[in-house]
Structures are given as structure tokens and as C-alpha cells.
Amino acid sequence: MEKTYTINGIITFIPQRGALILIADETKTVSLNMPASRCLLLLIQQDGKTVARETFFEEVWIKHGSQVTSNGFYQNISLLRRAFKELGMEGDIIITLPRVGVRL
């Protein structure tokens, strides 16, 4: 059985499929690329704690044999923000703390 996470009672996240699904209308979905899906999973697992950029690099890319640049990291965070907005989430669900990290 696939592990799922509910975000703000509005969206279901299925990491194995890289899928964000609107709970109120399951026909509204957004597919994430694997790095973006791993970024979101890491944020969820940290339960509101700030995650350092270097931790993302290690957990999302390096452990999986990939290289990453700061630009690639920020592009994936931006992709997550757009996905949440596309599904109707208002406000900034992903918060960037300059020179510190990112939190959900």
C-alpha cells in the first residue's frame, strides 16, 4: 500500500507517484518530478522544522547519485510552490528563510 500524506487537509501527496491530489476534487492532480517529490517528502518528514539547503542537496540528490546546483534546488522549490497554487492553496505553504533553509 502506498504511503500518503495530507497537507493542510486540502491536498493528498503520494511520494511514490510524485502526485499531489486535491481532496475535494480528485480529478485535479499535479505530477511532480522525482527531485521535487523528494524535496516535499523531506519537508513533510521534518514536521515544520527548517531544512538547510545542504540537507536537501545530500538527501534529495547526492544520496541518489545526482549532482545539483543552487539554481536546480531553487527551481524545484519553485515548482512545488506553483503546484500548490495550481491546486488552490492560498498563501506561502513553503517558507524560505534566507541563509537558513526552507520549511513547510
Language-model features: where?
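Short boundary/linker motifs that mark transitions into or out of structured domains
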Residues: 1-33
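Residues that recognize and position ribonucleotide moieties
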Residues: 11, 49, 95
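Short amphipathic alpha-helical recognition elements used for nucleic-acid or partner binding
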Residues: 29-60, 80
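DNA-recognition element of transcription regulators
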Residues: 31-40, 66-85, 100
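Short, solvent-exposed secondary-structure capping/transition elements
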Residues: 51-52, 86-93
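Short helix-coil junctions and helix-kink-helix linkers
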Residues: 59-67
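A short linear beta-strand->loop->alpha-helix hinge motif most characteristic
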Residues: 90-104
